[in-house]
Every structure is written in C-alpha cells, then in structure tokens.
C-alpha cells in the first residue's frame, strides 16, 4: 500500500530575542543566542577592535555606542531664520487720513441743518436785526494756495539687461550698393555706413588669378595639383616594346583586323570584344581586351609613347575575366639637327689672309714691278715676333682692282671685331689707321682688369727688437 504523506506543518522557531528573555535566567540558551543579542559575535569583535585605529566617518558601521569615535560628531551649522522680503507687485496708495477733534460729536450727521425744507406755503419773512455784529475777514494776497501732497515712496527697483547674441544678429552693411545703369547714364549711389562700431581687419586674397569660364564649383581651389604618377613600371606590369610605328597612330590594327564600318578615336581608351577563338595581327597583343589612352613621357633616349593594356587570359564560369596588365611602349626616333650653311654677317675684307706656306688668292691683284722696294720690318707682338712686309708701290702701277673708299667713316661698333691677319704673307695687310670702334675716355662704366680682382693680403706686423728697448 502507498503510504500517506505526512501533512504535519513545522512550527517556526522563536526569535533570538524571545529565546534570550526566557533562557538567560535558566541558563539553557543555545551557544549562538547570547553573543548575537549582546553584540559579542566575531564580526562585532572585529569592528570593535578595528575601529580603534580606523575612523569610518560616522557612517554607523559597527555596534558601538554611536558617539562618533574620538572626535565625536560635528553638528551641522544652523542659520537664523529671516523674514522674507515681500516685493509689492503694484505701487501702494497712501492712506486717507480723516482728522477728528476731541470736541466733535460722535454722531455723524448725514444731512446738514441748513438743508431742511419746510413744507407749505411760505409766509411773510420777518427780519430781526441782531444787536451783535460780525467780523468779515478778507485776504488781500492773491497768491494761490499751495497744497502739500505727499510723494509716493516706492522701494521697487527695476533693472533691464540686454545681451546681444552674435549668432542671431545680422552683420552691419559697410559697403555701398553697386552702381546702376539706366538709359545710357551711369548713376552712383551714396555710401551707406551704419553707426555700428566695427573693426578694421586686414583681408588676404585667396584666389589670385581665376578664369570665370573654368569655374565649376562655388569655391574653386587655387593652385595646380602635381601630376599623378602613371605607375607604368611596376613589378606586376609586363613591359613590351613595340617596334611597329602603327602603334602610335592606329593601335587597333595590332589587336584586331580593320573594320571599315567602324573607326573610333585612337587617343581614348579602347575596348575590344573577342570570340573564343581569335588570332591577333601581332602576337604581343594577344588576349588584349582594353588599351588605355596614350601617355607621352620623356626618357634619356627621347620621347616614349606608352599605353597600358589589360589581358583576358582566363574566364571563370561566373563570367569574370582574369589576366595581367601589360605596358606597351614605342620610342620615337630622335630628330637630327639640320646642318645649315651660315652666311657671314660682316662685309668681306679687302684681302684674304692665309698662312705663309700657302698661296693667297686675294680679292685684288697687284702687279709687282722691278721698281718696287720691299723692306722687312720686325714688329714685336708679345712672345712671338711677326715679320710684316711693308711695300712701297709706285703710282705708275696699273691693273689695280682695289675697291675705292665710299667716303663715309662707318664705325662697326664695339661688339663687332674685324679680322686682323696674324700670319706672314707676301701682301701688305690692310690695317685701318683709325681705331675699329669709338673709344670713350670719359664715361661712368669701366671694366677692371682680372689682376685687380685679387684681394690684398693683410700685412703681418713684425716686432722690431732693439737692444735698449724692452719687448713684451
């Protein structure tokens, strides 16, 4: 048989305080009741002996008497309550003061005695003369009466402070409006300057030179950016030199065959679509699907035309092309300098001077006779000596083709030097009597001789020694 479950409810144990009251006198208390009620547990002992050297700031930690430790508790400062100041919202009116004398009656009459009206028909009026007269007091002074009015004392003080927020304040306009043009006349308006205080700040010009046609954005950036690097000579780029000059003009002929129906621009990026099986006219351009626009670079050997190509060597199932990049370049041949025959700018001399070993075919021929006396004169010129033959030609010589003098003394100038013969010839050289160019003795400019450029050295002082003079 299944045993019936015990439904006995366990009673709650009495609290430690209740057990302490009954078992303390009889001495039957459990060992944990007395220390718990008297505050003598292990935790209380730790806090009790530890609070001797540690101050917890009056937080009430522990089971002490609550005296605040050695220093005790510090009372909070108290302030004397003061009466709040009442500020009236509206100005107060002065009180109405009614003067009441000591002999006045306490009964206030609503109607004066002279205002009683007698009913009935009025009878004859009798005038009884009075034995006692009355005094009439008049004032001669015509000054108006001055009434003292008490001023209203108001203790309310109202102050207004205004602060300007520059974020929500419009700036002052300090420049005049632009001039207007109407019916062919130019109208200028006066300068409009506000009274607001302003500060003169030096302004800098950010854009120096700009072209209105080339401005695209509202704030163009001045200056030139450095040219971007092409990056044609990397490790992952194949370098291929193209010899065919058609690479410069029509590179499409090297990739595909000519299509007369379509001819695109050759200076832009070219894209090609190949079938599965194709053969390029040039084997270097096999599997090329894109040729970028040309770039001209300067090399040591000359100018180089470069194009960056993209290959499509492999295709995946998803249609993605895989291939490397190729740098095709073609070096342009240098242009040789043309040898141009130069013509002399100076007029030809009257005679052509050659060396002594040759025969001179001059511009003029002089027939020498037996009467001509030739004397040899040695003229020293620097380190070498030169023999100049001075010939005395008689006036009877015929067949002379020397050009005659034009009669004008033309100076060739200081920058043009005439050729002076330096070799020994059998003919007399034509040396002009006057200088070849004008010489200005008095002038503001001069040229120093190279020997004058040397800076003079500073002389070293030498001490003279004498027998009767002491030296230091």
From Swiss-Prot:
Q: Report the gene name.
A: L2
The family classification in the record reads: Belongs to the papillomaviridae L2 protein family.
Q: List the disulfide bonds.
A: 23-29
Give a short account of what the protein does: Minor protein of the capsid that localizes along the inner surface of the virion, within the central cavities beneath the L1 pentamers. Plays a role in capsid stabilization through interaction with the major capsid protein L1. Once the virion enters the host cell, L2 escorts the genomic DNA into the nucleus by promoting escape from the endosomal compartments and traffic through the host Golgi network.
**A Pfam family recorded for this sequence:** Late_protein_L2
Q: What is this protein called?
A: Minor capsid protein L2
Q: How does it assemble?
A: Interacts with major capsid protein L1. Interacts with E2; this interaction inhibits E2 transcriptional activity but not the DNA replication function E2. Interacts with host GADD45GIP1. Interacts with host HSPA8; this interaction is required for L2 nuclear translocation. Interacts with host importins KPNB2 and KPNB3. Forms a complex with importin alpha2-beta1 heterodimers via interaction with the importin alpha2 adapter. Interacts with host DYNLT1; this interaction is essential for virus intracellular transport during entry.
What species does this protein belong to? Answer: Human papillomavirus type 34
What domain of life does the UniProt record list for this protein's source?
Viruses
The PTM entry states: Highly phosphorylated.
One Gene Ontology term, aspect cellular component: host cell endosome
Keyword Disulfide bond listed? yes
Q: Where in the cell is it found?
A: Virion; Host nucleus; Host early endosome; Host Golgi apparatus
Q: Where is this motif: Nuclear localization signal?
A: 1-14, 454-462
Kindly list the GO molecular function terms attached to this UniProt entry.
Answer: DNA binding; structural molecule activity
Which keywords annotate this record?
Capsid protein, Cytoplasmic inwards viral transport, Disulfide bond, DNA-binding, Host endosome, Host Golgi apparatus, Host nucleus, Host-virus interaction, Late protein, Microtubular inwards viral transport, Phosphoprotein, Viral penetration into host nucleus, Virion, Virus entry into host cell
- Write out the GO biological process terms: microtubule-dependent intracellular transport of viral material towards nucleus; symbiont entry into host cell; viral penetration into host nucleus
